[in-house]
Amino acid sequence: DRIKNLIKENLDSLSLSKELVTIKDDMDITFSKEDFEFKSIKDKDNVIKMVNDFELSSIISNLEKLEFIKVKNEPKIVKEKKYQLILNDNELHNAIDSILKSNIISFDLETTDVNPMTAEIVGISISTEFDQGFYIPILFPNNLDTEIIPKISYDNIYKEIELIFNCPETLYIGQNIKYDILILRRYGIEVKGELFDTMIAAHLLNPDRRSYKMDFLSIDYLDYEMIPIENLIGPKGKNQKLMSEIELKDISYYACEDSDVALQLHRLLSEELKKQKLDKIFYDIEIPTMKVLIDMEYAGINIDVSFFQKLSDKIGKDIESVSEKIFSYTNTRFNINSPKQLSEVLFDQLGLSPVKKRSTSVDVLEELKKQHPIATELLNYRHFSKLKNTYLDAIPTHLNSKTSRVHTSFNQTIASTGRLSSTKPNLQNIPIRTEISR
């Protein structure tokens, strides 16, 4: 019924959408497709530099296949990776003993969810030397071959893992390490040493970069291509696997590669921070800020759900009241949310003078207030609708079932200006201009 009603309400939009996507094939043209044939690239060096800068690596390979460019690649020396899958208590204790001898530990958690307040730990990888790593499995498929089923005493596994993070003099390295620390805290494990986040360091060095994913950082700084996660879990969609469903040998290598690459990135990024005289900002501002954000995210935000519901009901009635006022001006009912229907009402039926062609944007409605009171009611309608749909109804859906609080994520690497941003949900974009918003 919902889909049927949506189709009925948006019939005008559907016909317009069809018209917009229909290719017009009856045009008179004076050129042929051969006129647009791509024959050569004059400035090949700049093309290669540009696609590298914008991380468009697939374009280079396509151009090479078409023989438009030839990239001279030195043969890469592939180093042997010493990644160990921990399968029993003896291997676990030996690994922990080896790890604790180092004062620099890079680690990465494999989990079941991108939300740190609900994710379960699938396994943990740790590296203290380049091209080396240990993977400690926690969750894994039940249909494993008998030779590789872990025989670890899992009753005290987190007490064992806690030893690794109980070293105040140790530097702990990670990619988006805030996420991992939040999960470990939920499991009763505190990371007590100093911290280095490769993602934050890369953002500080280049705040306008398109992506700070470790795959891209690895290519740029290490000239090393990591295993794409899609190779393990498949593309996004209903058939995508969980990390806990991946064979141990595959997830072990993938996870160790993450902690290994983060360790190698640390050396280069820390050197670059010093070179650009950004190390003080990183260690005295960014990392302390991250620690505060960890506490804020973990604590969460308490909201009065009953108040949200009551206010949502009130705003719902306000929306109905404003809708009736709008219809009283037009003497006809229409879909207020349809830009096409609204523009027809404003400019054809009521005869208002268009400000920006037939736009019905907020700034246009502000101008139209001078011509007709319907514009004021339309602005009220949009304001109330946004309050109800985006905030009053949406924010309570983010309540954590165990804490009954909202645990938003504060991000240091999204805005190029350095300001914090908030996601899932966004708590920084709540309107406060009107009395009811406040």
Residue ranges and their predicted role:
Residues 180-188:
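Short Gly/Thr/Asp-enriched flexible loops that form oxyanion-binding sites at enzyme active sites
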Residues 151-169:
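Short, basic/hydrophobic alpha-helical segments
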Residues 178-181, 200, 209, 341:
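Conserved nucleotide-binding/hydrolysis micro-motifs of P-loop NTPases
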Residues 6, 10-147, 209, 217, ...:
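Conserved "right-hand" nucleotidyltransferase catalytic core of DNA-directed polymerases
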Residues 190-207, 214:
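Conserved beta-strand -> loop -> alpha-helix junction used to position metal-binding or nucleic-acid-contacting
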Residues 106, 169-177:
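Acidic beta-strand-to-loop metal/phosphate-binding motif
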Residues 106-108, 157-163, 196:
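Catalytic cores of nucleotide-enabled group-transfer and carboxylate-activating enzymes in metabolic
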Residues 88-92, 153-158, 177, 247:
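Amphipathic coiled-coil/heptad-repeat helices and related helical stalk/stem segments
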